[in-house]
């Protein structure tokens, strides 16, 4: 039997992830009028563009919900965000600028915590506002069924009856007005925004065109650093980690990591730090484009990565980066709690993050322009005296280096022989005008 219901299950409890926006408000009221028993569940993810969370469940009750709950997801969201940071679970980058997977992290938390709350209320049918072309429909599907194997999925936006009756925002707004609710449709923006405490995503509409750039976006977590009229003063900030956990900013210790991240957002946001423009592959392999904000995570990541490179050896760092990219893809695909993801994450947290103790001082300027001013850690393996060009007691002598270089003759000879073979079989065409090495046979030809 399919877990996806294509028509409204009348007479049954249906949980809906309720944001309080037009789409979910109209869907909830429509389900009530059509004979379902809707329950509303709102996730408090610390969205920077949400002013009054307590009012959202109240509105759901007004629109016909049989029950409405506000679930505080902030602590879990930050915990998962720091876990992603510790394991470098970020696979989307452009020219060294990173997308911090803030929406996928938010979906992992929302999808599990809301369905767990529904299960407590005996609600085994779940709906949300994700569309069939996006990533979220699959992410929520996976996370929901992980938590509740008996879960059925009903999405109004996959129900043709709902689409025929309320196919667009104008129709939904008129539907709410005719139902007696003074619901005023918000002004249309040139793009769509989704946010949580970790970051914001701006996409769709005008941003679907690659001829539209970051300048059409109005940041909600920082400043428009590209505008000449936005004054941004350089600022020095220190970030301290202990055993892989961020614990202090500018010497102020935080016992609550939610509060620490909020302060990191304020600091980074003053400079527009962590904004990026990315073209990515959705789960279904089609490409999409997004403008992202993540000022706090970006600030923490600069300090964390600096300590990683100063503490760990090259092979460990290589594994951390390779596994981080793999883990980032799994996170993006809605597999954050799959066994293979847990294995990669736990490995990084145990063998990389636990050694990360220290303090980094950073100068922030505009956007992603910054300088690292100092790095301190009791665990640093960076020892400049080993390689000092001054006359100091050395860990090895000139004769030691002569011996090491002499041993390199073996692989240099092997490389020369292989290049000769490639030339003989026509893979290389050496010549004076070629950038390839000049390979001569034994005869000197």
Swiss-Prot record:
NCBIfam families: argG, PRK05370.1. L-aspartate binds at residues 131, 135-136. Keywords: Amino-acid biosynthesis, Arginine biosynthesis, ATP-binding, Cytoplasm, Ligase, Nucleotide-binding. L-citrulline binds at residues 99, 135, 139, 192, 201, 203, 280. It comes from the Bacteria. ATP binds at residues 17-25, 43, 129, 131, 136, 194. GO terms for molecular function: argininosuccinate synthase activity; ATP binding; protein homodimerization activity. PROSITE patterns: ARGININOSUCCIN_SYN_1 (PS00564), ARGININOSUCCIN_SYN_2 (PS00565). It holds the Pfam family Arginosuc_synth. Its main location: cytoplasm. This is Argininosuccinate synthase. Homotetramer. It comes from Burkholderia multivorans (strain ATCC 17616 / 249).
């Amino acid at each position: 039997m399919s877990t996806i219901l294509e028509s409204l299950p009348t007479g049954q409890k249906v949980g809906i992830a309720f944001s309080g926006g037009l789409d979910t408000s109209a869907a909830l009221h429509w389900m009530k009028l059509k004979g379902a028993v809707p329950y509303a569940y709102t996730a408090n993810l610390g969205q920077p563009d949400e002013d009054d969370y307590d009012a959202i469940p109240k509105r759901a009750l007004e629109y016909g919900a049989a029950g409405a709950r506000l679930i505080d997801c902030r602590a879990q969201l930050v915990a998962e965000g720091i876990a992603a940071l510790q394991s470098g679970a970020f696979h989307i980058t452009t020219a060294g600028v990173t997308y911090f997977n803030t929406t996928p992290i938010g979906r992992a938390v929302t999808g599990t915590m809301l369905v767990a709350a529904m299960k407590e209320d005996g609600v085994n049918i779940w709906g949300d506002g994700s569309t069939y072309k996006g990533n979220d429909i699959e992410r929520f599907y996976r996370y929901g069924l992980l938590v509740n194997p008996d879960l059925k999925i009903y999405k109004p936006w996959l129900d043709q009856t709902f689409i025929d009756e309320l196919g667009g925002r104008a129709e939904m707004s008129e539907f709410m007005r005719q139902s007696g609710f003074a619901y005023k449709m918000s002004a249309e923006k040139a793009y769509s925004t989704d946010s949580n405490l970790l970051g914001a995503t701006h996409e769709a509409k005008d941003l679907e065109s690659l001829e539209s750039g970051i300048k059409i976006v109005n940041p909600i977590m920082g400043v428009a650093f590209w505008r000449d009229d936005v004054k941004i003063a350089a600022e020095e900030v220190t970030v301290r980690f202990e055993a892989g956990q961020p614990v202090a900013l500018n010497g102020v210790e935080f016992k609550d990591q939610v509060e620490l991240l909020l302060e990191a957002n304020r600091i980074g946001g003053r400079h527009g730090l962590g904004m990026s423009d990315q073209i990515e592959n959705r789960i279904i392999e089609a490409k999409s484009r997004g403008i992202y904000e993540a000022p706090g995570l970006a600030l923490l990541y600069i300090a964390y990565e600096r300590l990683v490179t100063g503490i760990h050896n090259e092979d460990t760092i290589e594994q951390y980066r390779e596994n981080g990219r793999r883990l980032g893809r799994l996170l993006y695909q809605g597999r954050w709690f799959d066994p293979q993801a847990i294995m990669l994450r736990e490995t990084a947290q145990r063998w990389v993050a636990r050694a990360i103790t220290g303090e980094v001082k950073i100068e922030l300027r505009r956007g992603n322009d910054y300088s690292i001013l100092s790095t301190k850690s009791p665990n640093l393996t960076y020892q400049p005296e080993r390689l000092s060009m001054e006359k100091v007691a050395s860990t090895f002598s000139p004769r030691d280096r002569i011996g090491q270089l002499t041993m390199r003759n073996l692989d240099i000879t092997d490389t020369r022989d292989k290049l000769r073979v490639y030339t003989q079989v026509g893979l290389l065409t050496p010549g004076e005008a070629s950038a390839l090495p000049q390979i001569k046979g034994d005869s000197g030809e």
